Amino acid sequence: MSGESGQPQPGPSHAGLYLEHPERDQAGVPGGVIRRADSQRRRSWIQKVIEQITGSPRQCVTLSEVVPVTVLAVQRYLLEDEPRDTVPKPPLYCYDVTISDGVYQEKCYLDPSLNFLVYQNILKVGIEMRISRVSCLYNEKRLGQGILCIDKVHCGESLDVISVETPFRNRAHEEKPERPLRGGKSHYLALWNNEDPYGDIWKTNKQPEEFNFNNIKIISLSHLELTWNSRKNFPALLVRVLHKSKLRYYGKPNKKMIEPYQTYLEVADSSGMVSVILWNALCPEWYKSLRVGLVLLLQDYTVKKSYPLRIQPDPADPQMKLISTMEICLNLRDPPTNIVIIPEKQLKSEWKLPKLINRFITRSELDDMPEKSICDVIGLLSFVGRVQRSKKKENSEDFWSYRWIHITDGTSEQPFIVQLFSTSQPEVFENIYPMTYFVCTQLKVVRNNSQVPKLLYLTTTNESRALTTGGHRGLPYTYDTKAKKIIQWIKTKTNLEAKNTVIGGYYPYPPVPETFSKYSRFIKAESLLTTISEVKKVIEDLQYREQKRIAIQGIITAIKYIPYKHSAGSAPAPEAFWNASRPSTSQAAGKEDHCHERGSKRSQDDRPMGSQHFQYTSKVLSLCAKRKILQGPSANPVPVPQPHSSAQMKGSKHNTPSQESSTAYTTGKSRRITNDRWESQLWQDKKFSLRDHLHYGHVDPESIPRKFILEHEKFLTQQFNSQPAKYIPPEGKPPKLDEFQSARSLGHFEVTILGLNHEIAIDVAFLPMYSPEDVQASQIDTFLTCMNFSCVYPPAAPLSGRLPDPKAVAGDIVKAAADLDRVHIIGILDICNLGNNKVEVCLQKIYTPE
């Protein structure tokens, strides 16, 4: 365990004077991993670069030889205040990037001006990268430690084959626990949030141990409450853990705490329940070993007045006294707290320690639960959404991680809908998938009965704990009557029912109210409406997996239906080049090379665009490739990606000749309507004179919910988790995401919305939730409920138990959009940054003026 002193730490020489690692035969093995066997020797590119720069710290060196390296790790930590950076407002966090040249690995420091490459998940593990400008830095808190700093980088594609078992050039990088290159911190943070324990400082080795209670004086919590102000020494406490909070990281650049963590335990004896706080280095030492239900003996603690703004969770037992005037503080030092886990077999009945009580409810009981009630649930996972993120505060670098899940328990046709935030249990949060047992405690009810459709879901609280298959054995709730019934019901589930489980994709929840006036009650006035011209800026500011909901005004001028069989295709994302010079476009390569240098502002070209902006251009497509895009695998028309600027569209036709010939004309508004598309006369008049046309109508494979297949559970789970901080070799040759069946058989629609001033237009995607195999899974979330258009989601299932044919439904949606010709509408858009310059913009709801 690392201490908290600020003394310089010993480290190896920056020169890394070790023998070069011999080159080995690069023989690929299953899983896309290269194992190496000693044979020949070759010079390490990393070694040559280090030797070139170590004599000139802080001076950028442009490398004459640039070779591809592999990214093996991207790790985040708090950057402390030090006279180090020329950046006027340095970011709160910085990143160490571990690379391999096939001979050595090296941990490098990413210049903070390139942090956005990580924010956008462009620089990530498993990609090929070319570094062409570097510098050398020294960590003045450690002896002789030299650091390779990345100042100019070209990020390429993910690699199918990754070399492993290459040693670190600098052996200090292999030491445990891992330490960041800069500053005095002893640990890394989780890559995408601060709540999850990450790295090898987090111990799990604490076990119950027999304890000799002779000569131990124990005080009750109620007695301590009455006397703590007049005591200097406190007798031991014997308590049971009833609740455990998620971790709180309170690190700041100007704070010198080595491990600035805090967590709360709610503990109780026969006289009441009180809060216990674990501080700083005690959290990595104990957090992962302390679980709800354990009995603890606490000695050498301190007591202080309770923090007035914190709200304690209520005891599950209404007869238990809640002690809210004091808090118990546990520290690694001053004084060093003594914590002992007492085995259950050593407990005595006369101690009268409270039992762990759960508040399980069934799904049928949830309908009657009041707002903000606290409950526990148990059931079977039927849907597991992707991991998403939301900012804790505006302009903050800190995010919450969460995902939506469905839990069924057999008592209702409806599932529990749960917004599952990270509970500092990454081993659970990142490894849940459909058709597994799932328990979640301390959930809060969120409801609004006046909204249509009614809003009802559960969300985690600060004390929520999650358990999945394999984590239940021996826990008290397995004897709970409700839990036992649900467990028996789960055992009756069949493989046929498993086929209806779903994982990942865009999930339009929570639903917005039926009127815009109700929607506006929950939005700040200054951020209620976003102009279409501002949408691009909103998208540029989003970080990886960050989701945001906005409202825009406009006129629906066109809609195009794209069937499922053509909706999952995705072109590879572009390679990105961050350079010391201004942005330039490589016409020869046919891909957009984005350039960036240390300390410069992020260029316009570096920002995430709609997938259609960069996927294909006529300059790089062969005739054969063009035909494939135009025809698709079944020779049916599919949309051709358009340039980002409307100026480049002038002179081109919106429809192909074959599409024009099949178009049916209607009278009155000169609209063109077929079963799969419509465009208004207004669009015909304005589309070639637009100032800008934003193309975000493409649907990436990640946006499509997939039918879950147990044999591919690891692959599917990884696809819809956040990008890992360290490279994980795949098992065998992994499949592609778009090979998995969509849970939305209807496909999607591309909707064009023209701004009210007829100067800017935006294409967005509309993905109706439609499943003919499972009527109950089709949610009432229509294209336009204010039109009383309900054929997509009939209020009651047809006698056949199946929904209408997808083509018929699609035709009705197209006609419904056509009925809005020249009508001013308000569109609610859900926007999510999918990483690697891919963005998802989905139409969630349409309002017409009230």
UniProtKB/Swiss-Prot annotation:
One of its GO terms (molecular function) is single-stranded DNA binding. The keyword Transcription regulation does not apply. Residues 228-331 bind DNA. Residues 590-608 have a biased composition (Basic and acidic residues). It is found in: Chromosome. GO terms for cellular component: nuclear speck; replication fork. Coiled coil: none annotated. Pfam families: RADX. GO terms for biological process: negative regulation of double-strand break repair via homologous recombination. Gene3D superfamilies: Nucleic acid-binding proteins. Keywords: Chromosome, DNA-binding. SUPFAM superfamilies: Nucleic acid-binding proteins. Residues 1-31, 575-612, 632-671 are annotated as: Disordered. Residues 643-668 have a biased composition (Polar residues). Single-stranded DNA-binding protein recruited to replication forks to maintain genome stability. Prevents fork collapse by antagonizing the accumulation of RAD51 at forks to ensure the proper balance of fork remodeling and protection without interfering with the capacity of cells to complete homologous recombination of double-strand breaks. This is RPA-related protein RADX. It comes from Mus musculus (Mouse).
